[in-house]
Amino acid sequence: MAISFQLLPELPVGVKHGVGGIIGQKLYAGLGSSGNAFFVLDLKDMNSGWKSAADFPGIARNDAAYTVCGNKLYVFSGAGIEGNNSFPTVLMDGYVFDSQINQWKRLERTLPTGFLGASCCSLSPTEIIFFGGYDKDTFNNFLSEISKIDVTKEPNKYKELITIFMSQPIDNYNWNKNVWSFTPCNEHWSVVGENPFKPNCGSGIIHKNNVVTLIEGEVKPGLRSLETKRYLFKEGKLEYSDSSASIIDICKNHEGLAGHFFGEIDNKIIVIGGAYFIGSQDAFIKGNLYAHNGLIKHFSSNVWIFDGKSWENKCQLDAAGIAYGVSASNGKAMYVLGGENSNGDAMTRCLSLLMD
């Protein structure tokens, strides 16, 4: 089965660590590195290119959890600078974008926990499910302390604080272990299960029928998970979960991925790009909790396909890797919108992917 890529019109500005999705025949992308900007591309009129949609009304943010549900785009949490702060904190608000009227609305209820870096998906047109997310207090306290240090005047103190924070065991970061459910019609939040695996941030997430597949992500800052997990939901509750076939089964030097693009085409899960540190898994096995210390972040260009039984490295996107962009798919095509390259640049390139 061949994979074909098609270049789409470029975004007006680069978008990394942002949000977006596909609603009907329109693609949306924005926030993250583009601030409060939000853009729309009509797939039936691509010659017109991306146009400005309604600006996001809340605090500009990176790495929010986002998904399309009931033909609306929902955005939760993320990290942004509130009030008079000089550093980002975990945001506890949510917003919904109504594409029919091109309008954002803030959700009335405060989030039950921080969802910075969390993964979420629509389990049905009336329910959104959440996995993972940074702990608000842990994140905020660390950013508060490190913001007090002038790295040019006190580089050793800065490095020491980073080292102490990164050298903690996985459980010390207290990432969200609960599987949360959100009902948009009444903004009701509930815990529908506890994740039996180590919680992740920056995972790929795909929903099909009553099964949610969670693909890798981080287990702590700088260290990736090597697992693909499946979660079966029944009557709104987490019924069963297990480990699935993983990329490391066919690629023994695989380091795991975070910030990868993901989608579903013809009942196959597609994973593209992502970032990781070469040597981090070996360092962690040897007892180095600061597993990515001194290592260079690598940006992948691999295209992986999962048929539910095994993974296959089908091809490469190009010579350069990419991560931290917006993923969207509709079962027939997958879209790779923006992202970040190995130089840290926010990308404007957009692609569609088809399987022939």
UniProtKB/Swiss-Prot annotation:
- Which Pfam family is an annotated match for this chain, by its short name? NANM
Q: Fetch the SUPFAM superfamilies from UniProt.
A: Kelch motif (SSF117281)
- Keywords (A to Z) from UniProt: Kelch repeat, Repeat
Report each Kelch repeat as a residue range.
Answer: 72-125, 163-210, 288-331, 333-355
What NCBIfam families has UniProt attached to this entry? muta_rot_YjhT
UniProt protein name: Kelch domain-containing protein VC_1773
Organism of derivation:
Vibrio cholerae serotype O1 (strain ATCC 39315 / El Tor Inaba N16961)
Q: Which taxonomic lineage does the organism of this UniProt entry have?
A: Bacteria, Pseudomonadati, Pseudomonadota, Gammaproteobacteria, Vibrionales
